[in-house]
């Protein structure tokens, strides 16, 4: 019997399509029942069309159930994935503009500080509603996978107060993993005196680099980095400072790496708003 996976907030093109690709890459899930729901009919229809096209192009038999009725989508679901942005971009704009009026310059404002708190106040009541629906209509052992921000707040609320088994997920680890592979490639060839274009140049891909990460959403760290049987964690600072692109684009991440010894999964700007000293004054923000 095939399992059912429901997406709430499926009108989020980037996240929904990326997650569908991940799901369909797992052989055991290629016969899953997929249900999409969203309150925005236009976005829901657009994303459904694109994802169905991806499915058909790969010769799979899945037909996406697309509905504006959340209860229909989650009925009998084994997994429910939350991708919602409560309040939409209009509310997100206020999360940035209101704090800025009082001198709080956030980069994204979706996790902590004033913006994160306002975002959480909108999201927590809604995710608790989702939990109530899941308990009533989904399978009894349904797992809620939360991709929405503020991730830690929403996941905590669903797990502790919603009474539904919940995990929080984010794509940040993969992005930094690619950067780390590039840095190791630079170091490996530099150690051997090999230049790009030489016939014995060594290319390093993500699949070649094994990582262990620890932390919470938007505060996660690569605490162990293994390539070719060796631990490269302590050489990350050297590599990032040498990299011709990353040393310019990842100044905050490199500074944090220098201070604390671990590279962060978060983007440069995102990381800058989680500590106290990068965004205190406009001229300092420009520096980083």
Where are these regions (language model features)?
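Metallocofactor- and cofactor-centric catalytic cores in central/energy metabolism, strongly enriched
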Residues: 2-96, 108-112, 116-188, 204-211, ...
